[in-house]
A protein has these predicted regions:
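Acidic/polar, glycine-enriched structural segments that form the non-catalytic walls/loops
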Residues: 1-70, 144, 148-160
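Active-site-adjacent structural elements in folded domains
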Residues: 11-15, 42-72, 114-121, 167-206, ...
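A conserved hydrophobic secondary-structure block that centers on an alpha-helix together
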Residues: 14-17, 63, 69-85, 89-115, ...
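Structural helix-adjacent loops and short alpha-helical linkers that scaffold large soluble proteins
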Residues: 16-20, 36-46, 89-99, 138-152, ...
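Alpha-helical support elements that line or immediately flank enzyme active sites
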Residues: 24-41, 71-95, 135-141, 215-224
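Catalytic cores of carbohydrate-active enzymes
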Residues: 113, 218, 222-265
Length: 265
């Protein structure tokens, strides 16, 4: 009870009815569910990003305590609409833990994840939602992690071979169904790509995700003084325009031949 009061008490509300206040704190409680500390008191945690499960350990302080907690949860996908903002305002220490968790996975498995689950990569949904998470944290001064290493991993994800190249639920190590080669070469991810696997493979959705994530990476690059990368990713963030069909009034998928795809709804 006291523990939940501490977490929920980070935000105090005034006014409104009692029912509205109950609803607010119930929703805040929901926003804090689903994330689990999986590291032990000695800093050990299970990592499954390699071919075999192994025990890894968080660095310890001079007093022998872990410098942060290692967490597991579902994918980050969609968190930029609300949770990133909430956590950065009310629970910055939690964002630091999450950022360090993702960097643990980058060190262990070679990719910053969409979301660590069971000590492994989930490949749920599409894109690289971790970049908006890191950009939020970094630009709000939440930086108790290796920011240079984070940027290195996020930049890797923004090119072929990174996490974006995994379509939704595409688990193979040599994933390509995310269409990053098309995105870089053509300025959008087309539908009708050959040899595509996975559950979420639609090119228009990928293009819009990648463009937004490029914008986020551009903001982080700018804040870190990486001007060339800022210009690169800011320019790439305009790729969403390549799928705007003025005639239909919608974002509309294209094929590999550059033609609009009909009956796309």
């Amino acid at each position: 009870f006291d523990e939940w009061n501490t977490w929920l008490g980070k935000i105090e509300v005034e006014g409104g009815s009692r029912e509205q206040q109950i609803k607010f704190y119930t929703d805040l409680w929901h926003a804090l569910l689903g994330r689990r500390v999986v590291s032990d008191v000695d800093g050990c945690y299970l990592d499954q990003t390699s071919d075999f499960p192994r025990i890894c350990r968080i660095p310890l302080s001079a007093s022998g305590k872990p410098l942060y907690n290692h967490h597991n949860f579902d994918a980050w996908w969609g968190s930029h609409w609300s949770l990133d903002i909430l956590w950065s305002m009310a629970y910055p220490h939690l964002m630091d833990d999450f950022c360090n968790t993702m960097l643990d996975m980058y060190r262990n498995g070679g990719l910053i994840p969409r979301g660590p689950s069971g000590g492994n990569y989930t490949y749920v949904m599409i894109g690289d939602p971790a970049v908006s998470f890191f950009a939020t944290a970094y630009n709000k001064g939440i930086r108790n992690y290796d920011a240079d290493l984070a940027y290195e991993g996020l930049r890797k994800n923004a090119f072929p071979g990174g996490i974006r190249d995994h379509a939704g639920y595409e688990h193979s190590k040599d994933a390509h169904s995310g269409g990053m080669e098309y995105y870089i070469k053509m300025g959008y991810v087309p539908d009708g790509r050959a040899n595509v696997v996975g559950m979420h493979t639609t090119g228009a959705s990928m293009t819009l995700e990648y463009a937004y994530q490029d914008w986020c990476l551009a903001q982080m690059a700018k804040a870190m003084g990486k001007q060339a990368d800022y210009e690169l990713f800011f320019e790439r963030s305009k790729n969403y325009k390549n799928l705007w069909n003025k005639a239909s009034g919608f974002m509309q998928p294209k094929g590999t031949d550059g033609e609009w795809l009909p009956d796309f709804d």
